[in-house]
């Protein structure tokens, strides 16, 4: 089977029963997309625990995220990508978390929305930020305030970031609505 060359990166939603480990299911989907038996797919972890495709698929990047009863898996070639999934549920501390972890401009943008739109906007922004951090490979410890998104009616756009993340113009973001009751985001930049 020829190896697909998706661009922008492709992604899928897979049901994942609560309590089950995500990696075997992610590995199976990645293997199917790459035409490789899952048990032969090399997925070593870097020093920060981020999985990386190895061997003949070293030019590819895969990432996954699970929440609730779902799993998102992404795959791209010649890109560094991250994906995040969040189960939609009440988050009464959304504004408190935004003020604590987001940039002041992002928190203000959420606070200036009508009350009914604040939690959904918080969750969309959280997913976007996690997707970038997962692509970067440092996770939340890197700092959610080291880069800034602008939220508009047309979507979310990265406008400023720490030098370690590179040029904001190099980043692409796709918001995902994979299933009712879930939101997600996929972020990538050229490798």
Q: Each predicted region: which residue ranges?
A:
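Core catalytic alpha/beta fold that binds nucleotide/phospho-ligands
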Residues: 1-191
């Amino acid at each position: 089977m020829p190896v697909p060359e998706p661009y922008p990166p492709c992604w899928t939603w897979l049901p994942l029963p609560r309590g089950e480990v995500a990696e075997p299911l992610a590995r199976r989907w990645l293997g199917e997309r790459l035409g490789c038996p899952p048990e032969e797919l090399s997925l070593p972890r870097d020093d920060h625990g981020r999985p990386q495709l190895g061997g003949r698929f070293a030019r590819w990047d895969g990432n996954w995220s699970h929440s609730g009863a779902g799993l998102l898996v992404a795959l791209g070639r010649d890109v560094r990508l991250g994906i995040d999934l969040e189960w939609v549920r009440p988050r009464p501390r959304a504004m408190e978390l935004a003020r604590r972890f987001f940039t002041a401009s992002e928190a203000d943008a959420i606070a200036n929305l009508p009350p009914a739109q604040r939690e959904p906007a918080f969750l969309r922004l959280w997913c976007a930020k996690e997707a970038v951090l997962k692509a970067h490979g440092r996770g939340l410890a890197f700092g959610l305030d080291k880069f800034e998104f602008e939220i508009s009616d047309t979507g979310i756009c990265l406008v400023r970031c720490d030098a370690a993340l590179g040029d904001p113009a190099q980043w692409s973001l796709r918001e995902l609505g994979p299933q009712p009751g879930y939101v997600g985001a996929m972020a990538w930049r050229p490798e």
